[in-house]
């Protein structure tokens, strides 16, 4: 059992494992909570015939999305299909128009404080 340090390293190692054994490689993602409020996520790629087990553990919630993308990509590899390229986001250009300068409006009435004279 090997714990890998980064998500990218886990992806490359599990991808090569899935390419070598596409029918028998399994991927699991578990979320654990402890009483001491230590929450963590474990991703595991396991191939039973050879006994190869790759693990990645993190306590960062932002990496959950990355791990789900990895699971999606590995499903393509296990079925023998190519991983589709990520769609590029289209940037729609809008013409720049000049904005009119805002004319200062009259100050609201009653907002001035009355001046008081000196007390004797």
Swiss-Prot record:
Q: Which GO terms describe its biological process?
A: SRP-dependent cotranslational protein targeting to membrane
Amino acid composition bias (Basic residues), ranges on this chain: 110-120
The protein's matches in Pfam families, at most eight in alphabetical order, are given as: SRP9-21
For this chain, the annotated S-S bridges are none
Query: Where in this protein does the record put region Disordered?
Result: 79-120
Write out the GO cellular component annotations: cytosol; nucleolus; nucleus; signal recognition particle, endoplasmic reticulum targeting
Output the Gene Ontology terms for molecular function. Answer: 7S RNA binding
InterPro entries for the chain: Signal_recog_particle_SRP9/14, SRP9-like, SRP9_dom
Q: Which PANTHER family match?
A: SIGNAL RECOGNITION PARTICLE 9 KDA PROTEIN
Q: What is this protein called?
A: Uncharacterized protein C17H9.07
């Amino acid at each position: 059992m090997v714990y890998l340090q980064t998500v990218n390293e886990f992806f490359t190692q599990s991808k090569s494992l899935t390419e070598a054994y596409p029918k028998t490689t399994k991927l699991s993602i578990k979320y654990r909570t402890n009483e001491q409020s230590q929450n963590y996520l474990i991703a595991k790629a396991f191939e039973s015939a050879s006994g190869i087990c790759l693990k990645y553990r993190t306590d960062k919630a932002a990496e959950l999305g990355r791990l789900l993308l990895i699971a999606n990509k590995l499903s393509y590899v296990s079925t023998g299909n190519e991983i589709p390229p990520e769609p590029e986001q289209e940037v729609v250009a809008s013409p720049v128009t000049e904005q009119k300068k805002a004319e200062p409006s009259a100050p609201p009435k009653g907002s001035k404080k009355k001046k008081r004279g000196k007390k004797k």
